[in-house]
């Protein structure tokens, strides 16, 4: 089996395993599957769970797409690949829980290959996971980062620190001067040694459930009211802003003629904006700002 097919098989299995775990945790709703094809090449399967007991919306998509010319978002930092044919596969998910005390989360793992005249001229892995709480708890954030650190350990002492820092820098809303959440891991252009880099991608993909599901279980029965729900919807607006303004995956998908419904499944089903909103000083809502700056969560 060639390298691309090995990655593809891993990713489809990862999607299946995460869907099964989410359905078990939710206990009510199930994923609906939407199979699709892309005119220029490839296709995918998008799965959406809606109106569950725990998750308002959980979307997880697998795609395997190809094209004859790299879109600007992919070739801007690799001008030598302009005009190359390409193929990319990946799994991307975003989960929006009902309960404002359960953080929103995102995970993506992907593999990209560029060819010219039938020869592979570049191939690399990318991905990561990050956490976006609205009412954060130190123990949740520390657990999240402990899992991230542990899965990075076999890949070198500097791996966690470097990819945590990359995550903090990437998921930053410059126009708001705040991070999207409390970070996690982010990496791209990992393509020096296939077996080593593929093993890391699998560690990240497999580690996601270990990082997230204990937080879901811990917070899913926390009581909340209209105040918390309104703040959750307001903060979801930041998620929308980041994904539509900065996110490279969203831009790549739209610029490459991808399926808009699948690309935009990351957006929350309900969201609101409020002009000039300022949380009451000393409130739980105001406390969130202390978490939206890069910091060492593991001491």
From Swiss-Prot:
EC identifiers of the protein: 1.3.3.3
Subunit structure: Homodimer.
Residues flagged as site, Important for dimerization: 175
Domain of life: Bacteria
Subcellular location: Cytoplasm
Enzyme class: oxidoreductase
Binding site for substrate: 92, 108-110, 257-259
Cofactor(s) listed in the protein's UniProt record: a divalent metal cation
Its biological purpose: Involved in the heme biosynthesis. Catalyzes the aerobic oxidative decarboxylation of propionate groups of rings A and B of coproporphyrinogen-III to yield the vinyl groups in protoporphyrinogen-IX.
Similarity field: Belongs to the aerobic coproporphyrinogen-III oxidase family.
Metabolic or biological pathway: Porphyrin-containing compound metabolism; protoporphyrin-IX biosynthesis; protoporphyrinogen-IX from coproporphyrinogen-III (O2 route): step 1/1
Major subcellular site: cytoplasm
GO cellular component: cytoplasm
Single GO MF descriptor: protein homodimerization activity
Residue ranges, annotated region (Important for dimerization): 239-274
Keywords: Cytoplasm, Heme biosynthesis, Metal-binding, Oxidoreductase, Porphyrin biosynthesis
Protein's name in the database: Oxygen-dependent coproporphyrinogen-III oxidase
HAMAP family: Coprogen_oxidas
Organism: Xanthomonas oryzae pv. oryzae (strain KACC10331 / KXO85)
Recorded catalytic activity of this chain's protein: coproporphyrinogen III + O2 + 2 H(+) = protoporphyrinogen IX + 2 CO2 + 2 H2O
Record-linked InterPro entries: Coprogen_oxidase_aer, Coprogen_oxidase_aer_sf, Coprogen_oxidase_CS
Residues noted as binding a divalent metal cation in the record, renumbered to the chain: 96, 106, 145, 175
NCBIfam families registered for this protein in UniProt: PRK05330.1
A biological-process GO annotation: protoporphyrinogen IX biosynthetic process
Active-site residue list: 106 (proton donor)
